[in-house]
């Protein structure tokens, strides 16, 4: 693996090891402190709980109708813009789709670009990217007095870079993924202590998934844990799943595969993370096995489709719960992990993790040991599973919707897109409600055999997608929902239909509001208690990212990326017409181009459009000549 790293010598690093540990702890404390400030949005999900919730309430359900654009910024790129910007100490950091440019703006005058990073990438990465050329965001590390504050980014060509947050200069760069075998990067980096955590992409090309921790200051690899293979590669702790041995323990990363199929077995993780400083565990999900054709890979295919809790320092897995053994539908299990502290049905206080999965089930686990607390359908139209057995953790399949070679499965709900995909959802701790964006889409599935060839798609299925039973199948609308969910009772307080899938996710605030963007190009605000639509605004292109909020000089702002794309937008972006193209997405979203077109940028809102340009001097040119 080639890598360019600017750092001190290995000998000096050994001498500095004790200091590095203390400086890492300092930096992590500083990051936690920044995440608690309403002025900032310093990481995906806002904080380590990954709940996309803000205590801000200057904008509330009583005045949200007064929201107006305060300013905008165009990224100059037209592919899908997922994730959200970061705001740290008066600066906004903006990322883009390929070629993964980064911009820093000062919030006093966002019309002036403080710095920009436009990396030179291997264009071959475009050909092996699965589902548009998206990227899910940036990470911030606050520095430790010796190393400056950093912006961490991933590139589609598999590189990870650390930029000086003040100047944009590259501090280090390292190759994480090999595009020659189809391994790319779309994930947002995740900073914990003195490490930056990086996932992987490419399961559709047979890439074996892994999670890597790098020293945030130098780019040196600290540990790497695989999703499949021998226990030593998986970094299974000696007490792995000790509280839940029925989930499986040792030897299964190879023993649940035929021969060496695990070597090209997928399980990449390109979604979202959460972290609990109390348990020191990083929580994330692994993706689908490869190929999609289930006949070609007998067995449970562990540990794809798994929620892992891994020690942040060592990478060791303390627990792993496989949600969909022997996945048959591409239900990649990488979706958002949201942390909460609630009382269970018996009144016992629990530290919980809630995860809405692509397979149509929303799971809640005890995040200290992985014990399953609840597992409920995201919608009553889910038909691949009848239920989940809480004692064994196993889903109860309906064989009618299996995808074996001797059976042409029709009207499978959910589709391969899942009833939930990469959208980053929110949790309101006062209401104990999760606000989730849903893809209400079903499919027909026709499997076929194919050989593995490195760097080529390794799928083995033709898909046709269309609206779910609650949608309009004649007009191909009603493909999405917004829902308010209680993880303890399993009840949905309210749900609202949308024209298209709600792909980007939601943000909740103490102003009794839930914000989200839509594929047809609206930013919307709903009442947290009732789901009533209180406000909407037409933005320049469809939204596949999630909203964020911050304050600057006493004013609350709400920001969202515009830029349709991602898997739902591949037909529009690449001008495709075959309904089975785009791995089935083109047919489902055949009407999308009637409502929006490509774009790329950020729109920032405030009450009455108040902002930096209320000052007539901001943004004006002044001659230096006397």
From Swiss-Prot:
Taxonomic superkingdom: Bacteria
Signal peptide (from-to): 1-27
Any single Gene Ontology cellular-component annotation: outer membrane-bounded periplasmic space
Molecular function via GO: alcohol dehydrogenase (cytochrome c(L)) activity; calcium ion binding
Reactions it catalyzes: 2 Fe(III)-[cytochrome cL] + a primary alcohol = 2 Fe(II)-[cytochrome cL] + an aldehyde + 2 H(+)
InterPro entries for this protein: PQQ_b-propeller_rpt, PQQ_MeOH/EtOH_DH, PQQ_rpt_dom, Quinoprotein_ADH-like_sf, Quinoprotein_DH_CS
Role noted for this protein: Catalyzes the oxidation of primary alcohols including methanol.
Protein name (database record): Methanol dehydrogenase [cytochrome c] subunit 1
Gene that produces this protein: moxF
């Amino acid at each position: 693996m080639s890598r360019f790293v600017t750092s001190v010598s290995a000998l000096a690093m050994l001498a500095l090891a004790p200091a590095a540990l203390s400086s890492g702890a300092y930096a992590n404390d500083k990051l936690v402190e920044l995440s608690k400030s309403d002025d900032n949005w310093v990481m995906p999900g806002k904080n380590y709980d990954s709940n996309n919730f803000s205590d801000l309430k200057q904008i509330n359900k009583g005045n949200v109708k007064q929201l107006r654009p305060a300013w905008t910024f165009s990224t100059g790129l037209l592919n899908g813009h997922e994730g959200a910007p970061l705001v740290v100490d008066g600066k906004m950091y903006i990322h883009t789709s390929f070629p993964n440019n980064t911009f820093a703006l000062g919030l006093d005058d966002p019309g002036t670009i403080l710095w920009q990073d436009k990396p030179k990438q291997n264009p071959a990465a475009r050909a092996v990217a699965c589902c548009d050329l998206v990227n899910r965001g940036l990470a911030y590390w606050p520095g430790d007095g010796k190393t400056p504050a950093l912006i961490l980014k991933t590139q589609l060509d598999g590189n990870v870079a650390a930029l000086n947050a003040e100047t944009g200069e590259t501090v280090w760069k390292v190759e994480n993924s090999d595009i020659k075998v189809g391994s790319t990067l779309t994930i947002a980096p995740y900073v914990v202590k003195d490490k930056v955590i990086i996932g992987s992409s490419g399961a559709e090309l047979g890439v074996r998934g892994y999670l890597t921790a790098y020293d945030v200051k130098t780019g040196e690899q600290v540990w790497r844990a695989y999703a499949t293979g021998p226990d030593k590669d998986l970094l299974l702790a000696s007490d792995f799943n000790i509280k839940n041995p029925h989930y499986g323990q040792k030897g299964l990363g190879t023993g649940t595969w035929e021969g060496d199929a695990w070597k090209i077995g997928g399980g990449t993780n390109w979604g979202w993370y959460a972290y609990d400083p109390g348990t020191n565990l990083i929580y994330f999900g692994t993706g689908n096995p490869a190929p999609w054709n289930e006949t070609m890979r007998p067995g449970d295919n562990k540990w794809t489709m798994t929620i892992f809790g891994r020690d942040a320092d060592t990478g060791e897995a303390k627990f792993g719960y496989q949600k969909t053994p022997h996945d048959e539908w591409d239900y990649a299990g990488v979706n958002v992990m949201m942390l909460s502290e609630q009382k269970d049905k018996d009144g016992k206080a629990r530290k919980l993790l809630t995860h809405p999965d692509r397979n149509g089930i929303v799971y809640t686990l005890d995040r200290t040991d992985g014990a399953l607390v609840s597992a409920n359908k995201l919608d009553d139209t889910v038909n691949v599973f009848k239920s989940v057995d809480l004692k064994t953790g196993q889903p109860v399949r309906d064989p009618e919707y299996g995808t074996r070679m001797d059976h042409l499965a029709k009207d499978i709900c959910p589709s391969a897109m899942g009833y939930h995909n990469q959208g980053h959802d929110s949790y309101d701790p006062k209401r104990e409600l999760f606000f989730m964006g849903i893809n209400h889409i079903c499919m027909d599935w026709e499997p076929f055999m194919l050989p593995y060839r490195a760097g080529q798609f390794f799928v083995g299925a033709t898909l046709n997608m269309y609206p779910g039973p609650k949608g309009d199948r004649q007009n191909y609308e009603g493909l999405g929902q917004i829902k308010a969910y209680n993880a303890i009772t399993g009840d949905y307080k309210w749900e609202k239909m949308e024209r298209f899938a709600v792909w980007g996710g939601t943000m909740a605030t103490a102003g009794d509001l839930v914000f989200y963007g839509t594929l047809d190009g609206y930013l919307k605000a709903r009442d947290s208690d009732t789901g009533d639509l209180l406000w909407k605004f037409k933005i320049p292109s469809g939204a596949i990212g999630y909203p964020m909020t911050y304050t600057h000089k006493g004013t609350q702002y709400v920001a969202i990326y515009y830029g349709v794309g991602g898997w739902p937008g591949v037909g529009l972006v690449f001008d495709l017409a075959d309904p089975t193209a785009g791995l089935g997405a083109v047919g489902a979203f055949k009407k999308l181009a009637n409502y929006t077109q490509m774009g790329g940028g950020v729109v920032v809102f405030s009450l009455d459009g108040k902002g930096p340009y209320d000052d007539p001097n901001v943004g004006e040119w002044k001659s230096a000549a006397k």
